[in-house]
Amino acid sequence: MENSVKMDNSGNSTPLPQRQRRANNQPNKNIGKLGPQKQNEGASDGGPAEKRQRFGPNNQNGGGGSVVGGGGGGGGGGGQNQNKNFANKGGFGGGGNRNRNRGGNQNRSNFQNQNQNQKSTTDAPKADGGNLNDKSNEANNANQSNSNSAAQAQAQLQAQAQAHAQAQAQAQAQAHAQAQAQAHAHAQNQAFRARGGGGGGGGGGGGGGGGGGGGGGGGGGGGGRDRNPDRRGGGGGGGQNSGGGNNSQRGDDFFYSQRLRSISGPTHELPPIEVAQETKFSGRNRLYVGNLTNDITDEELREMFKPYGEIGEIFSNLEKNFTFLKVDYHINAEKAKRPLDGSMRKGRHVRVRFAPNATILRVSNLTPFVSNELLYKSFEIFGPIERASITVDDRGKHLGEGTVEFAKKSSASACLRLCNEKCFFLTASLRPCLVEPMEVNDDNDGLPEKALNKKLQEFNQERSVGPRFADLNSFEHEYGSRWKQLHDLFKSKQDALKRELKMEEEKLDAQMEYARYEQETELLRQELRKRESDNERKKLEWEMREKQAEEMRKREEETMRRHQTEMQSRMVRQEEDMRRRQQENTLFMQAQQLNSLLDQQEGFGGGNGGGGGGGGGGGGVGNSNFDNFGGNSNSPFEVFRGNNNSSMAGNNAGPGANNQQQDSFAAFEFGVNNMNQGGNQRGNNGGNNVPWGRRRF
């Protein structure tokens, strides 16, 4: 598939490092190639497949079968088999076998797969506008066709051998059964384990191609892998599912079950069956015509039976000289049987009989409550019914059996198969209906004298004596009595067996009722145990939910308690902060009041000096109040704290006029330690003269 990529232009480009060229390496063989063989160095250089490019850009082989297509490739001449071959698109006959072989598989089939499938690169490429390498490769291959004649001859011989093998495989697949076809395909493809096709019989959709027919299409024969999972490995003969067979039986069973479900339910009221007219060309009108010559034709048979009615289908077996044919109505069949049976034709006595009717079934083991309508409705699921009736005695009593006549033999066969494989119940009783073929003798003519062979010795011996009564105590009477006793014994045993069967049926009915009661009781017990277990489970779930709710409630209470505690502590802290702020506000108000008092004292300080020259003493007296306040160690003002100026009223005679010009607040100028005990108040202040800005609250 890489011929569009790997061209013979080694002189223009440097090839990739390859394995050393092997001696006597044959070129790649393209089986069934219709065009000239193109030489390809990429496939014959001895290099491994993984070293080369896996897929080319556009190389779909539409004509020749590649390495993997094999003997059956391409559907045997034109039908496209979608088997998903990405490396070798093409078949032997140009049908496009798309086997799912991506290259690298070693197809070791009988004839065609002698090369080890190193991803065939000699396929003829399609003409593509954007694929320039294909055109150059075609021009180059035209010059190299002379050097490839030996490979061409060998490929053609192998193609012929492959075509012969394919034709032989197809003929065998059509002539033999499924097992033989599969064995043949396996014998031709015993070493084929790759994912593609190949082999004489099919080769991944070869031979018949496309999932059926011929040499095992749809992945049959060669073991190809079809993309359709339902058609994988359809062997040899038929190519669908398992070679010749299909899943129609399984599908019919499914439809029967669907129809049965549609009528399952109470059957208390069933509509009456309309009496239909006689079906034309039914199974009851089928005649057997024997002892014919092998030169008879269908036209002669139609002319023979034409006076008695219309003739339907005719089946002739000239090797055994008999024929089956259908007359339109039963009365016409009877009319044709009487005169034609025993008639002479070309020196032979023609035998005309009613053919065995395989569409009539006998249904037994029925309960007394099964009517014609229920029997008809129950067996109608298998196919159209011509007649269904319950057998009764001369008094109209139910005999426990009936007959069902189908319109088709296939419906009767399906009914017989399913009723024998499974238990088919018509009512609530567990008595399954028993179905068996019923041979109906519609021949009312019996055995006429002309039908006997009078040339036999036994005939002459038996007919030598006529009818008679035996004398008492004679030889004939003795052995005649023994025959009667033998038949009486048979009848008595038959009656005893019937009575025993009746007793066993009644016993089985009683056991069935008891078993049904026990089974229903066991079902009730199981239901009770189930409900008890459900009750226990629900109780455990309820307790678990209650426990979870209790735990959640406790967690919520703990959370609320913790939240309340936090709120209380927060409120206590807020109250303490508020109380502290109130105290600070009170102290601040007191400080403001004191400041206002100090401001007032500063504004009216001259009046406190005692007036005039004698103000020294008066000032001292006036200052004594503040001295006591300042000496208080509990004062919040630093300016008054520790002021021990207590003897200002003593020797306070300054220089005269200078001392009187100062106000009486000289004691507040004002260190913490004013140790002026008796000296000049305005003169030497022993403390720190701190300004008013030193006040601290």
From Swiss-Prot:
Keywords assigned by UniProt, alphabetized: Coiled coil, Repeat, RNA-binding, Sensory transduction, Vision
Any one Gene Ontology BP term: visual perception
Region span, Disordered: 1-253, 551-575, 601-697
Biased composition (Gly residues): 61-80, 195-223, 234-246, 603-622
Bias (Polar residues): 1-29
Taxonomic superkingdom: Eukaryota
InterPro entries to which the protein is assigned, alphabetical: NOPS, Nucleotide-bd_a/b_plait_sf, RBD_domain_sf, RRM_dom
Basic and acidic residues bias: start-end ranges: 224-233, 551-565
Biased composition (Low complexity): 102-118, 139-191, 623-635, 642-659
Domain RRM positions: 285-357, 359-445
Entry-linked Pfam families: NOPS, RRM_1
GO molecular function: RNA binding
Record CDD domains: NOPS_NONA_like, RRM1_p54nrb_like, RRM2_p54nrb_like
Entry coiled-coil feature ranges: 488-586
PANTHER family linked to this entry: RNA RECOGNITION MOTIF-CONTAINING
Role this protein plays: Required for normal vision and courtship behavior in Drosophila.
Name recorded for this polypeptide: Protein no-on-transient A
Species name: Drosophila virilis
Originating gene: nonA
